[in-house]
Amino acid sequence: MSSLEDRDPYALFAEWLEEAGTTEPNDPNAMALATCTPEGRPSLRMVLLKGVIAQADAEGGFIFYTNLESRKGGELLANPHAALCFHWKSLRRQVRVEGPVVAVSDAEADAYFASRHRDSRIGAWASMQSRPLQGRFELERRVAQFAARYAVGAVPRPPHWSGFRVVPEVIEFWHDRPFRLHDRVVYRSEGSGWTHSRLYP
């Protein structure tokens, strides 16, 4: 195992993610995303990491996409802070990220949306994410409706669909060790660089 200390945390994360791609049965880029209402009520769900900008400033971060009218979208717009957790059981490793959240640009959202499978683009129009659904048939009816609407030509990005970038103030690396004497190293952003320290397990 490479050292956890005196590293660029983005580079270390990239190494771990690449290794997870060879050992995890599926979705090594899956991450738990925690959001919170302005009143302090948290919620948590799994999403997929779709990009990393490896800069130790406000322009860097971990990117994901979502329906802005979903619960997580609403919470992020009202309280733009989040935490992420990657857990790779096959490697006995975990990475936690904490920081403010900023919206991606329309150009970034358009480019990623255009790269998705056509059926997924139709689904983004059909799904009123996080709102009550009477039954599966209702969802399938909406899918058919939007598939017919966009039967010819490109499927545009819905105005309620975009992405966010979590700008890390904290990145913590955890590696399992025997007898629960695990390795924990936390990096904190400071200006254009990082400081790091070890934590008791």
UniProtKB/Swiss-Prot annotation:
Keywords: Flavoprotein, FMN, Oxidoreductase, Pyridoxine biosynthesis
Pathway(s) where this gene product acts: Cofactor metabolism; pyridoxal 5'-phosphate salvage; pyridoxal 5'-phosphate from pyridoxamine 5'-phosphate: step 1/1; Cofactor metabolism; pyridoxal 5'-phosphate salvage; pyridoxal 5'-phosphate from pyridoxine 5'-phosphate: step 1/1
EC identifiers of the protein: 1.4.3.5
Catalytic activity entry: pyridoxamine 5'-phosphate + O2 + H2O = pyridoxal 5'-phosphate + H2O2 + NH4(+); pyridoxine 5'-phosphate + O2 = pyridoxal 5'-phosphate + H2O2
GO molecular function, one term: pyridoxamine phosphate oxidase activity
Binding site for substrate: K50, Y112, R116, S120, R180, L181, H182
Keyword Oxidoreductase: yes
SUPFAM superfamilies for this protein: FMN-binding split barrel (SSF50475)
Residues where FMN binds: 45-50, 65-66, 71-72, 94, 129-130, 174, 184
tRNA-binding listed as a keyword: no
GO biological process: pyridoxine biosynthetic process
Record-linked Pfam families: PNP_phzG_C, PNPOx_N
Co-factor binding details: Binds 1 FMN per subunit.
Superkingdom: Bacteria
Cofactor: FMN
Function of the protein: Catalyzes the oxidation of either pyridoxine 5'-phosphate (PNP) or pyridoxamine 5'-phosphate (PMP) into pyridoxal 5'-phosphate (PLP).
Subunit structure: Homodimer.
Family: Belongs to the pyridoxamine 5'-phosphate oxidase family.
UniProt name for this protein: Pyridoxine/pyridoxamine 5'-phosphate oxidase
Organism name: Rhodospirillum rubrum (strain ATCC 11170 / ATH 1.1.1 / DSM 467 / LMG 4362 / NCIMB 8255 / S1)
Gene: pdxH
